[in-house]
A protein has these predicted regions:
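Class I SAM-dependent transferase core
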Residues: 1-38
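Alpha-helix N-cap/loop-to-helix initiation residues
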Residues: 19-20, 78, 167-169
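Short, conserved glycine- and acidic-residue-centered signature motifs
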Residues: 19-27, 49, 138-142
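Conserved SAM/SAH cofactor-binding pocket of Class I
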Residues: 26-107, 113-116, 122
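Class I S-adenosyl-L-methionine-dependent methyltransferase catalytic core
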Residues: 76, 80-83, 88, 104, ...
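Mobile active-site "lid"/loop adjacent to the S-adenosyl-L-methionine
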Residues: 118-144
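Conserved Class I SAM-dependent methyltransferase catalytic core
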Residues: 141-194, 199-201
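Short hydrophobic/aromatic beta-strand or adjacent loop that forms the aromatic wall/cage
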Residues: 200-208
Length: 212
């Protein structure tokens, strides 16, 4: 399957249907949020955590909001899709890693923008495929992310995570202890203009995080 980004290059993102955890839907709102919050800024390197086939990252790259892109995902098949996207679109400014942890990234990888549509739920009904995309038990993946991402942030770097209040019912407060322990701080919380619907399973919001 192909998902075509909306920028000038119209990057053809290669993927299987099971890999889409919302990246082709509410994930594409990232473009507007970044353009509105950081007007006229072009980031040196964007990192998409829990990338899947990198619908979000390739969209940001195609809109020229970053000069280069790094992605990682626990599933090797997702990273193979990223590599195929790089090949068919003749891209030379993308790095991709099959790892389930930020600690698994090479030390040299540094970013000034970090984005993600990570697993949003501690638990939720659904088949095995949905479970592996949607569930982060005990927020273990989030805890590991916050613990290790700081060493990869460039000065002035921004973390902008896309979360779902239907899963993190206390919103950013569910993650505040992990963020503070890592020497980071929340600088903004933004409700999705298009995909925040109270009492619905899509209650998307964004957490902006920076180094203290």
């Amino acid at each position: 399957m192909e998902f075509v980004t909306a920028g000038s290059k119209k990057i053809k993102v290669q993927h299987d249907s099971w890999m889409d955890g919302g990246g082709t839907w509410f994930g594409q709102e990232y473009i507007d949020i970044i353009q509105q919050r950081y007007p006229d800024r072009v980031f040196e390197k964007c990192y998409e955590w829990c990338s899947g086939p990198a619908f979000i990252g390739f969209g940001i790259l195609d809109q020229a909001l970053c000069k280069s892109l790094c992605v990682s995902d626990i599933y090797a098949d997702a990273i193979k899709s990223v590599e195929e996207t790089v090949r068919v679109n003749f891209l030379s400014n993308v790095s991709a890693y099959a790892t389930g942890t930020v600690a698994g990234l090479p030390e040299h990888e540094k970013f000034d923008l970090v984005v993600a549509n990570p697993p949003h739920f501690l638990e939720c009904p659904g088949d095995d495929n949905y479970q592996r995309i949607a569930v982060d038990q005990d927020w273990a993946a989030h805890q590991e992310f916050f613990k290790n991402i700081g060493q990869h942030l460039l000065p002035g770097g921004i973390i902008l995570l896309q979360e779902n209040q239907a899963g993190s019912m206390n919103r950013e407060k569910d993650f505040e202890p992990f963020i503070a322990k890592a020497g980071l701080e929340i600088t903004a919380v933004i409700d999705s203009p298009q995909h925040y619907t109270p009492d619905h399973y899509t209650q998307i919001y964004y957490i902006e995080i920076r180094q203290k």
